[in-house]
Amino acid sequence: MAMIGVMEDSKLHEDMENDMLGDLTSRAREALALFISISLRDNTELNLVVPNGPSWLSHVDKKDLYLNDETLKKITDILVAKDVTGNYNIVNVAIAAAPQHSQKRFVIYIKTSIYVEIVVIGNMKSNLTLIADGQDSTIITFNLSSSNSKRTFNTATFASNGDGFIRVDMCFRNTTWPVKGPVVTLRVNGDMSIIYRCRVEEYQDALYPHKNRQCYREYFLMDTVDFICGNAAAVFQFCQIVHMDG
């Protein structure tokens, strides 16, 4: 009986390893397929927004993204600013004003400032672009943690669930670190999401590319441990991942 038990345990362990290997292989294939779809042939276009972007970008989006960011700012639909120049002074309010299930690109420009809020983009907010003034200029920050009776998944300072989401030139922070355990700063769920020239600062589990197709380009991540976790088919181009002292 003891020998049978050992054999059964061994078979169970082998099955678990095979299942895990199959899952990892499947994810690797998805990531490789996405990587192949992104052309890097022409490095002279690095100053453009997501040059030679993923094949799943629409023709209209590719045309818009070949504009430089200053041109994009001039075609915004909503302006967020802490002074009187903006349509709104709260990022969440501006996002709420964006149309649901939009078939065309809707652009929100967030001017230089520090915005202390939890930003959540619902799954009905599709084809939304957020563009800002730079990683050191436009900062979205909060201090929610798992010690606030929240699952780590729900601690994100910024969470986007809508498909076709694009964000450019901003910084995201979760300032609970290091005293309150693992938290998330940026969580991305929506399919065909692009994060370009953005910065994330965190202590643990900073970036959560949860699922679907995602592309990160010229992205800066500062963390101490468990930098990136998630199940997305995500590609990282020209990114920096920096370890900071805990």
Swiss-Prot record:
Glycosylation sites: 127, 143, 174
Residues involved in substrate binding: 152
InterPro entries linked: Pectin_lyas_fold (IPR012334), Pectin_lyase_fold/virulence (IPR011050), Pectinesterase_cat (IPR000070)
GO MF: pectinesterase activity
UniProt-listed Enzyme Commission number(s): 3.1.1.11
Keyword Protein biosynthesis among UniProt keywords: no
Reaction it catalyzes: [(1->4)-alpha-D-galacturonosyl methyl ester](n) + n H2O = [(1->4)-alpha-D-galacturonosyl](n) + n methanol + n H(+)
Pathway: Glycan metabolism; pectin degradation; 2-dehydro-3-deoxy-D-gluconate from pectin: step 1/5
Entry annotation: catalytic residues: 205 (proton donor), 226 (nucleophile)
Site (Transition state stabilizer): 204
Keyword set, alphabetical order: Aspartyl esterase, Glycoprotein, Hydrolase
Highest taxon of source: Eukaryota
One GO process term, biological-process aspect: pectin catabolic process
Enzyme class name: hydrolase
Residues spanning the signal sequence: none
Entries under Pfam families matching the protein: Pectinesterase
Family statement: Belongs to the pectinesterase family.
Function: Acts in the modification of cell walls via demethylesterification of cell wall pectin.
Protein's UniProt name: Putative pectinesterase 57
The species this protein was found in: Arabidopsis thaliana (Mouse-ear cress)
